[in-house]
Amino acid sequence: MTEETVQPLIEFKNVSLDYGETKVLKKVDLEIEEGKFYTLLGPSGSGKSTILSLISGRLQPTGGDILIEGKNVNSLPSNQRKVNTVFQNYALFPNMNVYDNVAFGPSIKGFSKKKIDQLVKSMLKLVKLDDFSDREISEISGGQQQRVAIARALANQPKVLLLDEPLSALDYKLRKEMQSELRELQQRLGITFIFVTHDQEEALAMSDWIFVINDGKVEQSGSPVDIYDEPINHFVANFIGEANIVPGVMKEDYLVSFAGKDFKNVDAGMRTNERVEVVIRPEDLDIVVPSRGKLQVTIEDQSFRGDSYEITAIDDAGNEWAVQATNPAKIGQRRGLKFDPEDIHIMRLNESEEDFDARLESYEGED
Ligand SMILES: Nc1ncnc2c1ncn2[C@@H]1O[C@H](COP(=O)(O)OP(=O)(O)OP(=O)(O)O)[C@@H](O)[C@H]1O
């Protein structure tokens, strides 16, 4: 039986964008399905907003193809795409009240007054601003402005909502609140959200699927859990959460050597004695008495994080380990580090997802 393939809502095939000599996007492939929450996560300048501009039609690619519902839209104007964007600065009309801001899109489309009214009221209800219709934009808070911007975009009834760092102007608490509100809104509406952020915590908390973008390329894509637990390379491991990354050698299947010792692990399929990078997350390390530790360390530093202590320890081979611990430690003390085989994650050196797959295929072909 063949599995039915779902046509992606949006596809990027080998999409490049150059500004003269500057290559901003380098042969990007993406697939976006209907009804999910996607996040483009990457550092400043990596090309996230450029990808949104290509989806919305504000920019055209210099190479490759962009497809929406299977049709090439490389040169389809923005206003003919069922896509709307919520910008970082909200871009609200300051001279209009809340109601008129939301009514703007539907009025341009020539809908009847009654239909516009219904639409605006339901959108304002959706973002919990039904009592704020008559307020001027200057009379509402940042978080409320953010909601108006979302209601305004949704009033255009898009298939896809693009959100370009929409929470970055909010304070920590409001930002957290809006994260769950946005997530809930997306689930309720069932439309596709593509959210841009450089905040990994935000991406992990909100998304069904994350694209990690770096230097105009997709470094890795996957569910938040996949990306956190199985980062494909040094960049992703470092960018997504805190990671201890030390050099190692895969001696054989399920046996890795690092910090001068051999450890059982759960990875297989690499060459004998292949050089690798070993990743262990700070929360997967426990500080114990030296005799119970798999590695012996000296406590170098510690800082209080509110709900935990971040401890820095140095092993006898000179590797530095960040440990997230519930109890404080004493600087200068000799301790042990404990971890389980499944907490050891192995990364091949400088390997892209494509190279990794190609190598895996050739490995499987050798049987
Ligand atoms: N008109 C332009 N000419 C030349 N380079 C440009 C132009 N517009 C953008 N760039 C470059 O393209 C790169 C990607 O920009 P983009 O805005 O997509 O990044 P980003 O990941 O969204 O960053 P941020 O998180 O800071 O918004 C940047 O290095 C930027 O300097």
UniProtKB/Swiss-Prot annotation:
GO terms for cellular component: ATP-binding cassette (ABC) transporter complex. The keyword ATP-binding applies. GO terms for molecular function: ABC-type polyamine transporter activity; ATP binding; ATP hydrolysis activity. It is an enzyme of class 7 (translocase). It catalyses: ATP + H2O + polyamine-[polyamine-binding protein]Side 1 = ADP + phosphate + polyamineSide 2 + [polyamine-binding protein]Side 1. Its EC number is 7.6.2.11. This is Spermidine/putrescine import ATP-binding protein PotA. It comes from Oenococcus oeni (strain ATCC BAA-331 / PSU-1).
